[in-house]
Design a protein with these regions (language model features):
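C-terminal cap of metal-dependent C-N hydrolases
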Residues: 14-16, 180, 201-241
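His/Asp/Glu-enriched, well-ordered alpha-helical/loop segment
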Residues: 135-206
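Divalent metal-coordination and catalytic microenvironments
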Residues: 10, 28, 33, 58, ...
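N-terminal metal-binding scaffold of metallo-dependent hydrolase/deaminase domains
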Residues: 1-47, 212-214, 232
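Residues at the N-termini of beta-strands
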Residues: 37, 96-99, 226
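Short loop/helix-cap segments at secondary-structure boundaries that form the rim of catalytic
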Residues: 41-49, 109-112, 125, 136-137, ...
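Divalent metal-dependent hydrolysis catalytic cores, especially in the metallo-beta-lactamase
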Residues: 68-71, 84-127
């Protein structure tokens, strides 16, 4: 089996597995929607003439983000609700949120660039979603949401809250990254995503920074260079494999 998509020369690959393994100068090989190899060293055995290759030199790769508390526009007419939801989901997608958990079954959808699942259970760990809710006592383990749909809250990115948590409240980068990737996947039984491991779905973000710490220290500058959903790059342009 050869790779349909291969990302090479990754400065830092944050797998978000149970040990939070970080691989340096690594590569990811994908066969259609699944990850078939992550490693360092030579990747040539995974190539054939049809393999699409992405060079991520000087960049890091993380799992695509998961927002576990999306609230749709339920207070408007159905037609307006669908239109407003589409606009909101597009804006979140531009900020790397490729999976969402929603409390409205009408908002469920699975598309090439983004999935929305109906919330069938309440999380056992707290969800941080508003800057005004942040206290000096931050729970050791938490999930993160951008808080879209709360009263007077039109935030389409988890960058503002993660910036404050990292810079002001000194929450470590591992805790932050897991709160928007592997932890929500585990909490809502999305076993096919949330980490970069062999056999998982290739939902990936390529960031224009060498470390995740740099990403959490930055506001106001788009740092997502590439987005890959189900093993296919769709941002900044489609790359058919």
């Amino acid at each position: 089996m050869k790779a349909t998509l291969l990302i090479k020369n990754i400065e830092n690959l944050y797998t978000c597995d149970k040990d939070f393994t970080i691989l340096h100068h690594a590569f990811i090989a994908c066969h259609h929607e699944k990850i078939i190899e992550i490693n360092t060293g030579s990747y040539k055995e995974w190539l054939d003439p049809a393999t699409r290759v992405i060079d991520a030199q000087g960049e890091c790769v993380v799992p695509a983000f998961i927002d576990c508390q999306f609230k749709s526009f339920t207070h408007v007419r159905l037609g307006d609700q669908l239109r407003q939801d589409i606009n909101a989901l597009y804006a979140m997608r531009q900020n790397g949120i490729l999976t969402l958990i929603c409390d409205n079954p009408n908002s469920q959808r699975m598309k090439l660039e983004q999935d929305v699942f109906y919330k069938k259970n309440q999380p056992k760990i707290p969800v941080l979603q508003r800057l005004s809710e942040l206290k000096n006592e931050i729970p050791e383990t938490f999930l993160m949401s951008c808080g879209f749909g709360l009263p007077n809250s039109y935030v389409y990115s988890m960058a503002p809250i993660s910036y404050v948590l990292f810079q002001t409240l000194r929450v470590c980068s591992r805790t932050l990254l897991e709160s928007m990737t592997s932890l929500p996947a585990k909490e809502f039984n999305l076993s096919d995503r949330g980490s970069i491991e062999i056999g998982k779905t290739a939902d990936l973000l390529v960031l224009q920074v060498t470390t995740i710490e740099h990403y959490f220290q930055t506001l106001g500058r788009p740092l997502i260079h590439r987005m890959i959903k189900n093993g296919i790059q769709f941002y900044p342009e489609w790359m058919v494999c």
